[in-house]
UniProtKB/Swiss-Prot annotation:
GO-annotated cellular components: cytoplasm; membrane
Name the UniProt record assigns to this protein: 3-hydroxyacyl-[acyl-carrier-protein] dehydratase FabZ
Family label: Belongs to the thioester dehydratase family. FabZ subfamily.
Keywords recorded for this protein, A-Z: Cytoplasm, Lipid A biosynthesis, Lipid biosynthesis, Lipid metabolism, Lyase
General function of this protein: Involved in unsaturated fatty acids biosynthesis. Catalyzes the dehydration of short chain beta-hydroxyacyl-ACPs and long chain saturated and unsaturated beta-hydroxyacyl-ACPs.
Highest taxon of source: Bacteria
Amino acid sequence: MSTPEVTPTLSDSNGNEAGVQTQFTIQEISDLLPHRYPFALVDRIIDFQPGKCAVGLKNVTINEPFFPGHIPDRPIMPGVLIVESMAQVGGVILTQLPGMRGKFFAFAGIDGVRFRRPVVPGDQLIMTVELQSFKLQRIAKMQGEARVDGQLVCGGEMLFSLID
């Protein structure tokens, strides 16, 4: 009877364990979240630390379905959709927690959300979301912010609840 080999855990330059997925394509996001066009508001996850945080991006184009009505002759991304974009990044974090794959989390509240500048066609929205707490395997609190060209666009706290 032989003793099983123990392989040391390898880490990447960010301290993530080898084999841990740190980026997600739009198809992989679609496999995790139920949102579809026109409400799929995250194009990629560019950094992911399991159980901690994620950074997602949304390329904002003139072809977005909300621009014709918001606002004619001066297209601006609605603030609620910026918050929804951050929430979808948070959804990726939650669906990657142990036992949460395939579960659906909905907004339970938002606090302290502030909008600092408009998001317009051609902008690349970078959303950073951090998991602050996850209680009773049902309620999550997250802090999120969205930036364009390094400038803060929006930030605030989001609460999520597991929907059975």
